[in-house]
From Swiss-Prot:
GO terms for cellular component: cytosol; endoplasmic reticulum; ER body. The modification Phosphoserine is found at residues 217, 235. Residues 197-211, 223-233 have a biased composition (Polar residues). This is Uncharacterized protein At4g15545. The modification Phosphothreonine is found at residues 213, 226. It comes from Arabidopsis thaliana (Mouse-ear cress).
Amino acid sequence: MSEIEEEEEEGSASAITGSRSFDLPDELLQVLPSDPFEQLDVARKITSIALSTRVSALESESSDLRELLAEKEKEFEELQSHVESLEASLSDAFHKLSLADGEKENLIRENASLSNTVKRLQRDVSKLEGFRKTLMMSLQDDDQNAGTTQIIAKPTPNDDDTPFQPSRHSSIQSQQASEAIEPAATDNENDAPKPSLSASLPLVSQTTTPRLTPPGSPPILSASGTPKTTSRPISPRRHSVSFATTRGMFDDTRSSISISEPGSQTARTRVDGKEFFRQVRSRLSYEQFGAFLGNVKDLNAHKQTREETLRKAEEIFGGDNRDLYVIFEGLITRNAH
C-alpha cells in the first residue's frame, strides 16, 4: 500500500510540475485527471467546445453580414433604377431642347418674314395714303371749281371748215382760266418756250374762259350730258374736248381743245376732262391709275418725250381700255400740232 501511495504522490507531483511549466492555474490542475490519456480526452472535448462556440459565433456574424449585404444590394438596385429614370428624363429633356431650338429657328425666320411683310405693307399703306390725299385734293378742287370750262365756236354759214369766230352773245360759265396740255419736249429743248393751246383759242383772258354760244347752233353735249338745242343744223362736226386734271398734274388747270373734223353729223360732241378722269379712276386699278398720273407728270416735267408717254399710256390702258387711250392720244397729238 505504501508503494501505491508513493506513486500517486509522484504522479501528482509531476502534474504540478507540468502545470507550472505550462502556466496552468492550480484550480484546473486539481480537476484534471492524473492519466495523460484522460487529460488528452478532456483537452479534445474542451477544444471541440471552443471550436463549436467559435463556429457558431462566426456563423451568426456571417448571417448578419449576409443580411447587410442584401440590404445594400437592394439599395443599389433602387439607386440604379433611379439613375436609369434620371437618364431617361435627361434624354427626354435633350429631345425637347432640340425641338425647342428648331421651333425657335422657325419662329425667328417667321418673325423676319413677318417683319419684311409689315414693312412692305407699311410702304404700300404710305403710298396709298399719299394717293388717297392726291385724289381727295383733286376731288376738292373739282368741287370748288364746279363745272368745266366750255369753248363753243360759231360755225360759218357754208359747209367748209373755217376758223371759228367769237360771238357777241358769249356767256362766261367759269371763272378760272384753262390751260392746254403742254407738249413734251426733248432734253435739249428745255429752254425753249412751251406752246399752249390757249394761245390758239379765242379766249377772252387768261383768267376767264368764255363760252361762245351763237344763235342757231346745233345741240351741244356738256359734261353733265344735258343737250342744248338750236334750230339750224350744220354739216361740219366739231368736237369740244375739255381735259380736267388733278392737283399736281397739268399745273392744276383744266385744258380745253376744240377739234374740227369734216363729216355729215349735225351735232357737236364735247368730251369733258373731268368725266374722262372719273372714267379713268373707275376703270383702272389704283396701281394703274397711279402709273398713269406718274406718266403724265413725267411728260409735264419734260422727263420723257410724247412718244414715250403714249407708249407707256398704251401699256397702262391695255386692250380693254382702248377708247381711253384713243382720247388721250388725240389730246396729246393735237396739242403738239
